Amino acid sequence: MHALGRTPALTLLIFINIFVSGSRCTDKNQTIQNDSSSPLTQVNTTVSVQIGTKALLCCFSIPLTKAVLITWIIKLRDLPSCTILYKVDTKTIETSCLDRNITWASTPDHSPELQISAVTLQHEGTYTCETVTPEGNFGRVYDLQVLVPPEVTYFPGKNRTAVCEAMAGKPAAQISWTPDGDCVTTSESHSNGTVTVRSTCHWEQNNVSAVSCIVSHSTGNKSLFIELNQGSTTTTTSLLTILYVKMVLLGIILLHVGFAFFQKRNVIRT
């Protein structure tokens, strides 16, 4: 896209409005990174939004009195592209998008922001707002990425081991342990783009009775406390107890046999 008749005053206006517009369209559920290397007439932005929350995407904040046409071009990962447009002079709205979750945040004559009311994995893709003005065309491109918090489970294994699993997260979660152990971590990718991470750890030290599993993810971190199954230590103790009981019983039997033997010997002598 090309800008026509660009002036220093217009350049300053665009810089200021990018900042204000970006702050209006950002909430605690989405993270924005701007690509400052893009031309002034087009800003490329990466937006990360947690699944199930609302996403709000902005155009250039140009006064509608200067706009002729505002068009949102939506290209989702696995669906055909569609458009939502607003003709300023006739106040006409046209759309080819079938997803009712994707709408104008307000009325386009008031604000051209696009809203996704409940983000799903199917909403990942590119969202481009093109604003046509007499001074030129201005665009803002969003690469929308959906974050999925993993479901975290854990359980103690056998012989001083523990297992921690972060299921179906996007992106993949990171798992660490305190204290450090001898760990094996595996990951499994799913067809919907989520990843399951599983970490199994073993601790040799007998003085380690409990450990913590720390799951780190873009949507938040979790720390889990796990008591270790003592395993072989418990078995050894049980064996020693059984051996001790057997030795005591053997001693009692020998004592009875010895007593009976000496009693019989005394009877024979008399």
UniProtKB/Swiss-Prot annotation:
PROSITE patterns: IG_LIKE. One of its GO terms (cellular component) is membrane. SMART domains: IG (SM00409). The gene is Cd200r5. Residues 26-241 are extracellular. Residues 39-145 form the Ig-like V-type domain. InterPro entries: CD200R (IPR040012), CD80_C2-set (IPR013162), Ig-like_dom (IPR007110), Ig-like_dom_sf (IPR036179), Ig-like_fold (IPR013783), Ig_sub (IPR003599), Ig_V-set (IPR013106). It comes from the Eukaryota. It is a single-pass type I membrane protein. GO terms for molecular function: signaling receptor activity. Residues 1-25 form the signal peptide. The keyword Chloroplast does not apply. Disulfide bonds join C59-C129, C164-C213. Keywords: Disulfide bond, Glycoprotein, Immunoglobulin domain, Membrane, Receptor, Repeat, Signal, Transmembrane, Transmembrane helix. It comes from Mus musculus (Mouse). Residues 263-270 are cytoplasmic. The chain crosses the membrane at residues 242-262. GO terms for biological process: regulation of neuroinflammatory response. Glycans are attached at N44, N192, N221. Pfam families: C2-set_2 (PF08205), V-set (PF07686). Coiled coil: none annotated. This is Cell surface glycoprotein CD200 receptor 5. Belongs to the CD200R family. It is found in: Membrane. May not be a receptor for the CD200/OX2 cell surface glycoprotein. Residues 134-229 form the Ig-like C2-type domain.
